[in-house]
């Protein structure tokens, strides 16, 4: 069962249900991408043996033009969006379903399984600012934002 709620704004009933194992979501779909820190939520999700499904994994298209991601992409023969998607799927218990408006974009989104980001790439990405939210749903932002 998927979920679209975060641990910061969850109702007591939802958290109690998970604690009692009456209801266990399989995934929590939230905004997650290279420019948004979700470490607290990821830790909670992993502790509950769930998955995080990254919503807006390309930051509403902003990552396609990110110079650092373009540079890493050139190193691997990929584009910036492929680097961003690869970064997500290299993480434990993280999945993503990126939007693609054309057949070519869908093809590119699937062409991320033939390379891996190395430690240098991951360290470079880790140094980026991680406070940029692009999905603005009033009342849905977690309490820790």
State what each model feature region is:
Residues 1-145:
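Beta/alpha (TIM)-barrel catalytic core signal, keyed to glycine-rich beta->alpha loops juxtaposed to Asp/Glu
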């Amino acid at each position: 069962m998927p979920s679209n709620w975060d641990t910061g704004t969850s109702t007591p009933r939802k958290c109690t249900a998970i604690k009692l194992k009456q209801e266990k979501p399989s995934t929590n779909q939230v905004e997650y991408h290279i420019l948004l820190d979700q470490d607290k939520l990821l830790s909670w999700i992993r502790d509950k043996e769930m998955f995080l499904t990254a919503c807006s994994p390309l930051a509403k298209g902003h990552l396609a033009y990110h110079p650092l991601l373009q540079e890493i992409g050139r190193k691997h023969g990929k584009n910036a969006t492929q680097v961003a998607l690869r970064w997500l799927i290299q993480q434990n218990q993280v999945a993503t379903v990126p939007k693609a408006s054309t057949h070519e974009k869908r093809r590119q989104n699937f062409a991320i399984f033939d390379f891996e980001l190395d430690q240098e790439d991951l360290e470079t990405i880790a140094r980026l600012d991680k406070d940029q939210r692009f999905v603005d749903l009033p009342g849905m932002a977690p309490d820790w934002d």
